[in-house]
């Protein structure tokens, strides 16, 4: 019994542990500019996001500007994951909601235009080029989806006496754009 007790007491002295790497959380800001191309041409796009990196993952929130067909401001969550030892290659996804710019009434005063936002997604692959320990330049290529709806209401004026109320004529157009994007981004942070 004494031998077993001595062995159990001395056994921890022979065990070697591996040193665990410490993974820190860091803040990162990403500013991107590029073009989005679709069936009716190309337009500039801009994105700004900030968030936290942990290991090979980045999670943040952002806002952007998309001028394809209708000017709009996407608000999105930004998720990225790096591949490889240096994490130069990465995949990204930015789901969110797109807020259209206010649309001015066009034509007669009896016409009312109203834009409504919808689903937004930008996803693809990218490659980082380290400039120094705090700065990186990245190139991305991906797919961008933007959904909007445009409601046009025509109010018919009364032109004769006695006036008979005529219900307004309402047209609703739903737009869903699938675009190919390419962006150049600057990443600041570890």
Residue ranges and their predicted role:
Residues 4-13:
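Sec-dependent N-terminal signal peptides
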Residues 24, 54-57, 84-86, 130-134, ...:
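Outer-membrane beta-barrel channels and translocator barrels
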Residues 49-53, 80-82, 126-128, 183-187:
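Transmembrane beta-barrel domains of outer membrane proteins
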Residues 174-190:
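Outer-membrane beta-barrel "beta-signal"
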Residues 15-29, 160-162:
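Sec-dependent signal peptide cleavage junction
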Residues 30, 45-47, 76-78, 122-124, ...:
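Membrane-embedded beta-strand positions in outer-membrane beta-barrel channels/transporters
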Residues 65-155, 175:
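Outer-membrane beta-barrel translocator/channel fold
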Residues 25-38, 44, 56-69, 91-98:
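Transmembrane beta-strand segments that form the barrel wall of outer-membrane beta-barrel proteins
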């Amino acid at each position: 019994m004494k031998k077993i007790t001595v062995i159990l007491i001395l056994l921890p002295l022979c065990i070697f542990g591996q040193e665990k790497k410490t993974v820190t959380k860091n803040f990162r800001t990403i500013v991107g500019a590029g073009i989005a191309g679709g069936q009716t041409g190309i337009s500039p796009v801009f994105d700004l996001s900030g968030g936290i990196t942990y290991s090979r993952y980045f999670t943040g929130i952002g806002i952007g500007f998309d001028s394809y067909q209708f000017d709009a401001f996407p608000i999105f969550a930004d998720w990225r994951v790096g591949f490889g030892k240096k994490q130069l290659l990465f995949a990204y996804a930015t789901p969110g909601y797109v807020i259209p710019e206010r649309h001015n009434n066009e034509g007669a005063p009896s016409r009312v235009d109203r834009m409504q936002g919808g689903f937004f997604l930008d996803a693809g692959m990218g490659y980082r080029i380290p400039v120094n320990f705090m700065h990186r330049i990245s190139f991305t290529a991906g797919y961008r989806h933007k959904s909007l709806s445009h409601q046009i209401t025509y109010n018919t004026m009364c032109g004769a006496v006695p006036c008979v109320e005529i219900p307004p004529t309402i047209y609703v157009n739903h737009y869903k754009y699938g675009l190919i994007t390419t962006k150049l981004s600057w990443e600041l942070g570890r």
